[in-house]
Amino acid sequence: MPTILVQSYGFRQKMKTIFIPTALALLLAACSGNKVTETLKNEAYGNSEFYINKAEQSRNIEEQQSYRLLAVRKLIEENKVVEAQNTFSEILVAKLNDEQKLEHRLLIAQLAALQGNTEAQGVLRALPQTLLSQSQRLRVYQTQARIAENQNDVIAAVNARALMDSYMTDTQSRQANNDKIWEMLRNANRGMLEKAVAGPGEIGLAGWLALVVAYNQNMSNPAQLPQVIEMWKQQYPNHSAVLLLPIELRNVSSFQQTQLNGVALLLPLSGDAKILGEIIKRGFDDAKGTTTMQVQVFDTDSAPINDLLMQAKQQGAQTIIGPLLKPRVDEMLTSPEISNINVLALNSTPNVRAVAKVCYYGLSPEAEARSAAERFLKDGLQHAVVVAPNGDFGTRSAEAFAQRWRQLTNRDTDIRYYNQAFEVTSLLQGSGIGQGSGLYALGTAEQLSDLKQSLDNSPLANQFPIYTSSRSNSPNNGPDFRLTMEGVKFSEIPLLSDPSSSEYKKAEQIVESDFSMMRLYAMGSDTWSIANKFNEFRQIPGYKVHGLTGVLSAGPNCNIEREMNWLQYRGGSIVDAN
């Protein structure tokens, strides 16, 4: 019987893949030229290749035109700008009928918005609104949303997406739209949101603004959030988000505060990585202080991770902190022992995935690079250029920066890799870097010094701000280095940003001013802080803790992100750049 069921399911799947495109082809084949044109008012279910093929096969001019219009629409949805332009150029505008002309003008606006052209808004305003179908009105608001997103106008983008809801025909699309709205609002400036006011009739926008402001105001007290959301639902009972709450907020409704009972700390306490494990444990112990919480400590070099997890659970551990080394993290992720227990892994690997009750925290260059992209946006930069050394560190950092910059601005990053730092000047000449641009330069202190001197002796000197990472910050950097780096901004963890603090002095004494070890000490301290707010990080989007390694928050897959402090070299000294 099981075999029959499997065969039956496979047969249904096969028939489904055959039936849908076949039925679509039969439907369109049954249409006369006029009928095909009428489908312009409806949703297009084929892909661009399907409609291009239909246009090539048709001998009727009107059919050809309509199929090409449909093809352009799908190419825009597929973000294929060049192909959309090429297909658009094949349309004979003089031979379009009224229905085709309306679709043609809407596509002009959509394509312009995709390319970031400002003319898109004017084209939309000129459209005869009363002649638009429901599907076309949806695309008008989609285009308005894209225009607003191109201009980083969060309020206009949310308003357009709120208006889209009435014209969407399926629950999946409406849920995805609500999730996108919430993502934009969560990432927006809180002060701006509190001052924003919805216009007359903008009920959807008003509801969204009320929801995000109430959420932000109560985020520091997560236990109140379920009640806050229920009160909002009573105020806006007909709002789209009442029926389809953003997925991120669903966990909030069932939130329970972290109750830390029984911790197991898994670290390398023998072998080559012993020194790393010991300093992290010292930071953890100092943060824990006199708390009577029972903490079991396991050496990850003493036994397989699966065995250590079993032993920890048998001894009552409900939260696992560690392991630290990447191979051990991969080993842990394949263990059945991590089910139904909180796990804070102290590293991330390419195999990291979303696992219930698992978060990942570490001092990765990727997290610092993402923080740099956010700094670029905060400083009002429009164009991002990254120069990085060839190799693992450079590639990981550059790609992480580019990914975050794309998420924040919908723009690409110009990435250049170098073998020798003095090559950077020639790499940047002719790149278009200038006003409105920022350079994220990565490397060691020596590489950064060579790179900066090369730029200072070229026509590119003082043409754009330069940023770098903490990798170049070392206690061995003397006055000459600081003078060479004049004007350069760099990210650093809070612990190392304030040498006058008691935490800095304590860590400095423990590790004899070794910045690398001080960072690991700070990591150990923050590990204790994260464990104590584990549910908050996992379930409360945007929840933050101010730690010694940065302002900590949970990103995708519960990767703990770190918002860094920013310092600047000025007059031979290091000053606050915040």
From Swiss-Prot:
Q: Which InterPro entries match?
A: LpoA, Peripla_BP_I, TPR-like_helical_dom_sf
Topology relative to the membrane: Lipid-anchor
Location (main, coarse): membrane
Identify where the record puts lipid attachment of type S-diacylglycerol cysteine: 31
Q: Which UniProt keywords apply?
A: Cell outer membrane, Cell shape, Lipoprotein, Membrane, Palmitate, Peptidoglycan synthesis, Signal
Give the matching CDD domains.
Answer: PBP1_YraM_LppC_lipoprotein-like
Q: Which GO terms describe its biological process?
A: peptidoglycan biosynthetic process; regulation of cell shape
Q: Which GO terms describe its cellular component?
A: periplasmic side of cell outer membrane
Task: Please state the span of the N-terminal signal peptide per the UniProt entry.
Answer: 1-30
Annotated lipid attachment (N-palmitoyl cysteine): 31
Could you name the domain of life of the organism this protein comes from? Bacteria
Q: Which HAMAP family match?
A: LpoA (MF_01890)
**Assembly and oligomerization:** Interacts with PBP1a.
What is the annotated role of this protein in its UniProt record?
Regulator of peptidoglycan synthesis that is essential for the function of penicillin-binding protein 1A (PBP1a).
Protein family per UniProt = Belongs to the LpoA family.
Q: What is this protein called?
A: Penicillin-binding protein activator LpoA
